[in-house]
């Protein structure tokens, strides 16, 4: 499957009486991603399997994945159809999501994000200050 692969954005039955709506017809994977077409996302997840989807999320640096979390007697797992739509139990950090999407634009190469507060030269002078501002 490539960004040029074609997928049908159609109403898609996900079981349990639930349907993900789609109406654009045949679109490229690139278009499906750009337009955030939910039907295409879930169809792709079913095609490659949710296990593979979880593996890719791990490879792309998503650190909040849950496989077996019990809260008030209820068990949660991100290894489900909701993964394709971003429905993670504990959410996702924005910088991780940005770096995962950046890998698509970088020919599939993932670069771990680096956050900084300041950059100094060899004499200790501040070259870049990323500490930000706050006010009330």
Outline where the language-model segments fall.
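A short secondary-structure junction motif
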Residues: 14, 36, 60-64, 107
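Active-site-proximal helix/loop microenvironment
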Residues: 64-124
């Amino acid at each position: 499957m490539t960004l040029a692969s074609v997928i049908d954005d159609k109403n898609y039955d996900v079981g349990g009486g639930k349907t993900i709506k789609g109406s654009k017809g045949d679109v490229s994977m690139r278009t499906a991603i750009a337009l955030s077409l939910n039907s295409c996302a879930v169809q792709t997840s079913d095609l490659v399997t949710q296990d593979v989807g979880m593996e890719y999320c791990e490879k792309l640096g998503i650190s909040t994945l849950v496989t077996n979390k019990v809260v008030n007697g209820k068990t949660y797992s991100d290894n489900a159809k909701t993964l394709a739509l971003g429905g993670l139990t504990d959410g996702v950090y924005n910088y991780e999501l940005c770096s995962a999407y950046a890998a698509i634009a970088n020919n599939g190469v993932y670069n771990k994000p680096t956050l900084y507060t300041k950059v100094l030269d060899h004499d200790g002078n501040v070259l870049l200050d990323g500490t930000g501002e706050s006010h009330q």
